[in-house]
Amino acid sequence: MVEPREQFFQDLLSAVDQQMDTVKNDIKDIMKEKTSFMVSFENFIERYDTMEKNIQDLQNKYEEMAANLMTVMTDTKIQLGAIIAQLEILMINGTPLPAKKTTIKEAMPLPSSNTNNDQTSPPASGKTSETPKKNPTNAMFFTRSEWASSKTFREKFLTPEIQAILDEQFANKTGIERLHAEGLYMWRTQFSDEQKKMVKEMMKK
């Protein structure tokens, strides 16, 4: 027969063992929760980094779009300034600026509203006057729709060489995009630095 004292200690040890098992199980549960939390936290950090990168990419694209828009607006302003400058020069002395290229340097007069503009008087010397060379600067007096849609207009004011260059350079562009590209090309290649400087000075006024 077990003595009361021994029974007491056995019960106590048994209770301690059970409590230890409970503590061990609690610790295991806590470790599982910790592991799960760490995985969730790492996933959150990864998603946060991805989101931050996407935001940065969007910001970069926005800044690039803003820069491109400013470039287009600047180029368009320059082209409009060129048209205004040409009109002002024509109003002052009736003569447009000569083109930069030597092959198309001589200016061709603008079409006259006179219905008899196809008839020309022979020179006093009796010799046939030389046909004026085409001058692309005269093309700046016309609208974009005329530029794009009128084949006669292009043939009248642009040399075959210039037409071929435009068709080759901008074959993959259409509509307003092509009109802008062609206008910008003409501005950059057919106007001298002095002419561009004059236009920019007039735009500042």
From Swiss-Prot:
Residues 108-141 are annotated as: Disordered. Residues 111-141 have a biased composition (Polar residues). One of its GO terms (biological process) is symbiont-mediated activation of host autophagy. The lineage of its organism: Viruses, Varidnaviria, Bamfordvirae, Nucleocytoviricota, Pokkesviricetes. The keyword Coiled coil applies. This is Uncharacterized protein K205R. Induction: Expressed in the early phase of the viral replicative cycle. Its main location: host cell. GO terms for cellular component: host cell cytoplasm. Belongs to the asfivirus K205R family. The keyword Repressor does not apply. Keywords: Activation of host autophagy by virus, Coiled coil, Early protein, Host cytoplasm, Host-virus interaction. Residues 10-75 form a coiled coil. It comes from the Viruses. It is found in: Host cytoplasm. Induces host endoplasmic reticulum stress and consequently activates autophagy and NF-kappa-B signaling pathway. In turn, may induce autophagy-mediated STING1 degradation and innate immune evasion.
